[in-house]
């Protein structure tokens, strides 16, 4: 749940920093850091205060609404007339579409590269072990509480970074930008798992990117079918339910090996 508060937090922080004359690159990093701080708060409440994860997310989301409003000063703030990453790229002669695609590829490539490097270090392996099997990680001497907090910080930092980039693409920051962030993220991950499985870490991260693009593409197709925009959330929910059900269908339709071809089978 923290994700839906961290997303607009990154957008709000970056927008205000840009308006105050800070370089868009540093402003974008500022949004990332703000998200990490929000994640640290969630991680602290969950690990040290022993508040359940779901309640932690709800509490942080509720608090971040006021924080975001305090940062922005109003429900939405425009970046019109200010220099952003998008205007910097379009200033090189690229169209806005090509510039946004270029920025997206650059940031996605950097994030994937840095995550692959991090998750293959000793700290990264401890982080992965904590996520895969908490009890086993703790039994092997891993300080799981620290790893949880680190995981909260990294994930919410990246979510806030996404909000910072979207604000610069749209030209404004809005209090409600984070609505649906969790659904979109889950859909991208699950769709990637449905399409391909058992990939190395780097390729798995890229498959999630592809899943996110495919999910948004399907939503665009739904809108192109003259579906009422008010029904888009319902369509998203139905689509997510279908995506979640696909693995179950595949399991039911899975063809079992012929007994005659298995060791000990009839000849």
Model-derived features: positions:
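Single transmembrane alpha-helix segments in multi-pass membrane proteins
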Residues: 1-21, 28, 44-49, 190-197, ...
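Alpha-helical transmembrane segments within multi-pass membrane transporters and channels
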Residues: 22-62, 211, 215
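Helix-loop-helix "hairpin" substructures at the membrane interface of multi-pass membrane proteins
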Residues: 23, 38, 96-178, 182, ...
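Alpha-helical transmembrane segments in inner-membrane proteins
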Residues: 34, 57-85, 111, 156-174, ...
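Transmembrane helix-bundle core of multi-pass membrane transporters
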Residues: 53, 57, 64-120, 150, ...
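Loop-to-transmembrane alpha-helix initiation sites
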Residues: 53-54, 100-105, 148, 177-184, ...
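Cytosolic-side transmembrane-helix boundaries in multi-pass membrane proteins
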Residues: 132-139, 143-146, 203, 218-267
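Transmembrane alpha-helical segments in multi-pass inner-membrane proteins
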Residues: 159, 163, 169-234
């Amino acid at each position: 749940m923290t994700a839906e508060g961290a997303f607009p937090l990154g957008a709000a922080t970056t927008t205000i920093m840009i308006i105050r004359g800070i370089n868009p690159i540093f402003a974008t990093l500022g949004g990332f850091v703000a998200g990490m701080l929000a994640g640290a708060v969630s991680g602290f409440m969950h690990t040290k205060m022993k508040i359940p994860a779901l309640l932690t997310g709800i509490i942080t989301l509720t608090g971040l609404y006021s924080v975001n409003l305090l940062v922005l000063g109003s429900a939405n703030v425009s970046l019109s007339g200010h220099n952003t990453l998008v205007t910097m790229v379009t200033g090189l002669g690229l169209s806005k579409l090509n510039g946004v695609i270029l920025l997206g590829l650059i940031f996605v490539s950097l994030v994937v590269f840095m995550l692959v490097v991090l998750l293959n270090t000793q700290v990264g392996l401890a982080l992965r072990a904590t996520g895969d099997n908490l009890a086993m990680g703790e039994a092997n001497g891993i300080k799981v509480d620290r790893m949880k907090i680190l995981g909260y910080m990294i994930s919410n930092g990246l979510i806030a970074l996404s909000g910072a980039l979207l604000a610069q693409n749209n030209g404004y920051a809005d209090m409600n930008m984070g609505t649906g962030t969790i659904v979109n993220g889950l859909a991208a991950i699950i769709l990637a798992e449905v399409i391909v499985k058992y990939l190395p870490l780097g390729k798995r991260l890229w498959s999630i990117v592809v899943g996110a693009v495919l999910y948004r593409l399907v939503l665009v197709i739904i809108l192109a079918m003259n579906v009422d925009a008010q029904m888009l959330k319902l369509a998203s929910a139905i689509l997510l339910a279908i995506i979640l059900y696909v693995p179950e269908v595949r399991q039911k339709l899975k063809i079992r090996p012929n007994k005659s071809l298995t060791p000990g089978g009839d000849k």
